[in-house]
């Protein structure tokens, strides 16, 4: 009984006999809180007072907790161990006056109305909420408050509800600061990612612009070659560059249209042989290989002049006017083709070095070609003059008379006879061109002949490209 601090007879007698009062027990007295806390045992008033004093609670607070039936404690009792260190002085005696005062305070506790205490302290009796949050944790909270190592406030003006509210606010403040920091970091990360994305997009657009610029340069460099190829494909389809009047004349006869188609096919084959000859010359092929290619190209020229003869019989004006050629080629045409003498002048600088014998042969060939061209030119002038005189002569009598009709028919018959000689002039001019090429091949070596044929092909190819560029020029 003395270890538990009880109030038995032996303890009372000891307290009465000893003037210093009873000695406090050094053991840890066990204070058992019964299930029904409204019943207070008088024998343990002193222990209850010591417990209330050590926990730092006011008497009315303890009464508030002990008398309120909303704290439905669990049936099992919780043992609270009183730490002897919470007594300031072990030698201090407890007087009977203190015991009486404590007993009176405990009796007053049992008479206090718990609802009135709650209203005085401004606490709303939200019984359901308190039971929900604090019913199960009441034992742990009481143990924490009675522990001497718990940092609790000793200010009597601050009750448990206020401390709980301050604790909850402290717990909520930390996540709020953490959330604010996380949001700030997320915002900075978002800005950095957006800036990086903008930089990548700008770099990608710059690369695309540079790539497009390089492609435009390459396409411009190859434009002349592409125009020539497009012209060749157009000729394969029978589409040729000409004015509307010339085009109508070209389509007037089946012979002219057939010749245009044959010429397009011949030009395609000719370009293939020229490319083959160029590749062989660049590869430094032997004379035998070059001779085979040169002979095939000369055979192509022979075939071309044969096709022109057939077309001249069908429509001599179509062949003579050069409607199957481009406008730039027609500008340099002479009797339906090129001038042999002018071509030899262009080749003189491409065939060097020449031996003395070769130079003499080229000069003689050029002079003979020039003389033949002059003779044919004079013949054409004479024919044109005679044809003009025939058409201009005639009677000036009244129209519709029998004499005028007969004169008209006579003039047309004479003009038709003279026009028949145009085919002869065209054939002689083509023979001169073919003979000039064949004679040049005999004067030059195989490798020189290959260079000459390549130079001729390049010359006419540039004329065709010039014509295409001229027609494609912007017009104001």
UniProtKB/Swiss-Prot annotation:
Residues 217-231 are annotated as: Leucine-zipper. InterPro entries: bZIP, bZIP_sf, TGA_domain. Residues 191-211 are annotated as: Basic motif. Residues 135-144 have a biased composition (Polar residues). Gene3D superfamilies: 1.20.5.170. It is found in: Nucleus. Residues 201-242 form a coiled coil. It comes from the Eukaryota. Residues 10-25 have a biased composition (Low complexity). One of its GO terms (molecular function) is DNA-binding transcription factor activity. The keyword Transcription regulation applies. Its main location: nucleus. Residues 189-252 form the bZIP domain. Residues 256-473 form the DOG1 domain. Transcriptional activator that binds specifically to the DNA sequence 5'-TGACG-3'. Recognizes ocs elements like the as-1 motif of the cauliflower mosaic virus 35S promoter. Binding to the as-1-like cis elements mediate auxin- and salicylic acid-inducible transcription. Binds to the hexamer motif 5'-ACGTCA-3' of histone gene promoters. This is Transcription factor HBP-1b(c1). The lineage of its organism: Eukaryota, Viridiplantae, Streptophyta, Embryophyta, Tracheophyta.
